[in-house]
Amino acid sequence: MSTSPLVIAIDGPSGSGKSSTSRGVANRLGLARLDTGSMYRAVACRVAHLGIDPTTNPRDAIKVAQSCHLEIDTSAIDDRVVIDGEDVTKEIRDPQTSAKVSAVATIQPVRDALTARMRQVAADRGRIVMEGRDITTVVCPDAQVRVLLVADPAIRVARRQAELGEKVDMAQVIDSIVRRDRDDSTVSTFEEPAEGVTVVDSTHLNLDQVIDAVIDLVPVTLR
């Protein structure tokens, strides 16, 4: 197994399979893993807990992003997230939190603050899979492997509903995906591949096939 630095950057819209794919790739190659979306979700939780409305008071939301103590497990197994001493691992996946994320994630200084943290994690870990919306273009544009993971909208909705559980309303899932993609598209161009980014369409692939497709892009000398 290589010890050379390796960053695998995976971008994609909601429900495209980024999390399952990044976890699988990290497991197979023995890499660290960072779900960058969990950083935005954690900040959104903290902002809400402090009673801050980011739409009317973005300045205080920015302060939270810049000064909070954020702990994110980068193992391929655990997704534990702690912000300012509070474990928000479960809360950040709640549909109510999802509805609040865009208001925080679309504030450019918040993105700048968290981007700096993401880059530091990549530098500290050395060999890592990073998933998000703008990893291939903004966070790690020089990553050795850059992937845009896509899937048909119907497939994305079905995957997200399965992830959230049977009790989640389909209309709510569709609204969440459409809203997040629309809002995030105002601050990142994740829907079209940048130069040098490989598109992997997971619509007709199972998870193992998607993982294989990403790993095939990793130079043998870096595996």
From Swiss-Prot:
Main location class: cytoplasm
Class of the enzyme per the UniProt entry, highest EC level: transferase
Gene Ontology annotations of biological process type: pyrimidine nucleotide metabolic process
Residues binding ATP, per UniProt: G12, P13, S14, G15, S16, G17, K18, S19, S20
InterPro entries recorded: Cytidylate_kin, Cytidylate_kinase_dom, P-loop_NTPase
Gene3D superfamilies given in the database record: P-loop containing nucleotide triphosphate hydrolases (3.40.50.300)
EC number from the UniProt entry: 2.7.4.25
Bridged cysteine pairs (disulfide): none
Stretches the record annotates as Disordered: 1-23
Catalysed reactions listed for this entry: CMP + ATP = CDP + ADP; dCMP + ATP = dCDP + ADP
One Pfam family recorded for the sequence: Cytidylate_kin
GO molecular function: ATP binding; CMP kinase activity; dCMP kinase activity
Source organism superkingdom: Bacteria
The entry's keywords: ATP-binding, Cytoplasm, Kinase, Nucleotide-binding, Transferase
Any single GO CC term annotated in Swiss-Prot or TrEMBL for this entry: cytoplasm
Compartments it resides in: Cytoplasm
Similarity annotation: Belongs to the cytidylate kinase family. Type 1 subfamily.
NCBIfam families for the chain: cmk
Name of the protein in its database record: Cytidylate kinase
The species this protein was found in: Cutibacterium acnes (strain DSM 16379 / KPA171202) (Propionibacterium acnes)
